[in-house]
Every structure is written in structure tokens, then in C-alpha cells.
UniProtKB/Swiss-Prot annotation:
Protein name from the UniProt record: Chaperone protein TorD
Protein family according to the UniProt entry: Belongs to the TorD/DmsD family. TorD subfamily.
Designated gene of the protein: torD
Gene3D superfamilies per record: 1.20.120.1820, HscB, C-terminal domain
Keywords: Chaperone, Cytoplasm
Keyword Chaperone: yes
Cellular component terms per the entry's GO annotation: cytoplasm
InterPro entries: Chaperone_TorD, DMSO/NO3_reduct_chaperone, HscB_C_sf, TorD-like_sf, TorD/DmsD_chaperones
Gene Ontology biological process terms from the UniProt entry: protein complex oligomerization; protein folding
Entry function: Involved in the biogenesis of TorA. Acts on TorA before the insertion of the molybdenum cofactor and, as a result, probably favors a conformation of the apoenzyme that is competent for acquiring the cofactor.
Pfam families: Nitrate_red_del
Amino acid sequence: MTTLTAQQIACVYAWLAQLFSRELDDEQLTQIASAQMAEWFSLLKSEPPLVAAVNELENCIATLTVRDDARLELAADFCGLFLMTDKQAALPYASAYKQDEQEIKRLLVEAGMETSGNFNEPADHLAIYLELLSHLHFSLGEGTVPARRIDSLRQKTLTALWQWLPEFVARCRQYDSFGFYAALSQLLLVLVECDHQNR
């Protein structure tokens, strides 16, 4: 990626972690359709590989604003996709895709982090990977830890996530009939791919 700073990428990962970790509340629903968010999307579109994914997400958000009971409908989508059995869902856990659920724990230890007691999900949840990537990008921007060490850990995290993210995104696209989480996951996929290539 060329136009986004490490801090901006960190913010995108943190934002995505929040949206994949729990159902949207009324405040978040208002925020994603705000002028401030439109500016943020505009900034993301300064990165050419992200343009199509951001446009798709913006279209879903525009449709969402006229959807009756939008919050309840999105909550049902979230529940159906991420909290049910894996038959017609996109479970947000590395272990659901036959990946080593201990890998993220090792990466967190290496980063000097641990999961919060407030987050009642297994450590191999997608949001934990995204929080770790956010933390690493913020650390890159601060310059307090050697960049080579942070970058090595960032690459390991991206590689571990890439082992199962494409299948997760494919399942989101297959089973999310409204398309908000499908669009969100597509944006994440493109972001991770760009981040991974930016060695």
C-alpha cells in the first residue's frame, strides 16, 4: 500500500475487528452511514486495490439506510453467519477451517499481548487477528520497537490469517443474502492481501 499510513491501516483493522466481533448497535449503525465515514471511505479509495471493495460496502450501507428495522435485520444476519453451525454460516474462527487455533496465541505472546476478559470468544476469533494487526501497525508508526521485529510478526500474523480468510470470505459471500458482511469481509480480504504484499 502506498497512500495509507501505518496508523490509518491500524485504524481500518481496529474498525473491522469491532464490526466482526459483535452485532452493530444503533450508534454504530448511524456512524457507518455518516458524512465522517464517507470521508474515511474516500481516503480508503485513494488506495486503488481497495476501490471496488469500498464501493461495494458503500452500496450496502446506502441500501441499509432504507431497510426497515435495519439494526434487527443486521443482527439476524450476524447471528446467522457467525454464531450458528457451520452448515450455512461463515464461522469467524481459524479452527473452523482446520487451522491451528494455538497459532494466534503464540503470536499474541510474541507481541506481548493477551485477549481481554471482556471478549467472550475463543482466541482464534477473526477479531483477535485484526486487533493484533492493528496493534502491530500502530507500533510500526510509533517507532519504539525495531521495525524489523514488528514487520516479521506482522508477516507471520498475515500468513496465519491468510490460511483461512479466503474460505471465510467465500462463505460470507455465499450465505449473507443482504450482503453487508459479505462486502465487509471482501474489504478485509483485499486489505490483508495488499498488506501481505507490502513486505
